[in-house]
């Protein structure tokens, strides 16, 4: 998260927690016409998977947070507040969230290039808390990336496991079942014309 997003997350986290949900992270996206402030919320880990975030949770958080932002006013100018569940391509904001999703595939965007790249895709192997880093399996190698250098990270959904894998389209044309009737022919089985 950016410094501004971290500041806002620290400000709003107690309010969100008091509503029985967890603030996963904040995205602050400034733009010339007005910024977007996006909050990602989820149910506490102890209540998963029995309970999931629904529209009512998002509306409740939006109302309470909006009132707090009006009083605290941490953002100058116009902005749009969005409150969302993490979705299947869940964003990751903290080392604890990376640890919770060890073994899952992720897309990572770095602030500064590492090995000549800023974008990676790999499996979360483990957290190196001492180094403040996440270790990924990328292209068959273990790659350690400093947490402070991670700009964005999202889980890559396993569409097959979710039962949502795209189906291969059928080839156009007539389908053959192997039980088609043969048309009568003027030829015998040997391929010679029949005598009439």
Swiss-Prot record:
Sorted UniProt keywords: Cytoplasm, Ribosome biogenesis
Primary location recorded for the protein, binned into one broad class: cytoplasm
Superkingdom of origin: Bacteria
Gene3D superfamilies assigned: Ribosome maturation factor RimP, C-terminal domain, RimP-like superfamily, N-terminal
Region span, Disordered: 164-196
Compositionally biased intervals (Basic residues): 173-182
One cellular component term from this protein's GO annotations in UniProt: cytosol
UniProt-annotated location(s): Cytoplasm
GO biological process: ribosomal small subunit assembly; translation
Role of this protein: Required for maturation of 30S ribosomal subunits.
HAMAP family, sorted: RimP
Family listed: Belongs to the RimP family.
Name of the protein: Ribosome maturation factor RimP
Organism phylogeny: Bacteria, Pseudomonadati, Pseudomonadota, Gammaproteobacteria, Lysobacterales
């Amino acid at each position: 998260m950016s410094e501004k997003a971290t500041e806002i997350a620290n400000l709003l986290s107690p309010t969100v927690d008091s509503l029985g949900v967890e603030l996963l992270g904040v995205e602050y996206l400034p733009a010339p016409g007005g910024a977007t402030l996006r909050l990602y919320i989820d149910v506490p880990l102890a209540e998963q998977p029995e309970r999931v975030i629904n529209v009512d949770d998002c509306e409740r958080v939006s109302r309470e947070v909006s009132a707090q932002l009006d009083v605290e006013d941490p953002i100058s100018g116009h902005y749009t507040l969005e409150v969302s569940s993490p979705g299947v391509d869940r964003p990751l904001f903290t080392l604890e969230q990376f640890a919770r999703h060890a073994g899952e595939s992720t897309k990572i965007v770095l602030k500064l290039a590492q090995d000549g790249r800023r974008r990676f895709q790999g499996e979360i192997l483990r957290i190196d808390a001492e180094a403040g880093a996440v270790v990924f399996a990328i292209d068959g190698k273990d790659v350690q990336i400093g947490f402070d250098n991670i700009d964005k990270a999202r889980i890559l959904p396993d569409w097959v496991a979710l039962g949502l894998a795209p189906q291969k389209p059928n080839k156009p044309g007539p389908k053959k079942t192997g039980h088609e009737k043969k048309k009568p022919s003027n030829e015998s089985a040997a391929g010679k014309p029949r005598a009439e």
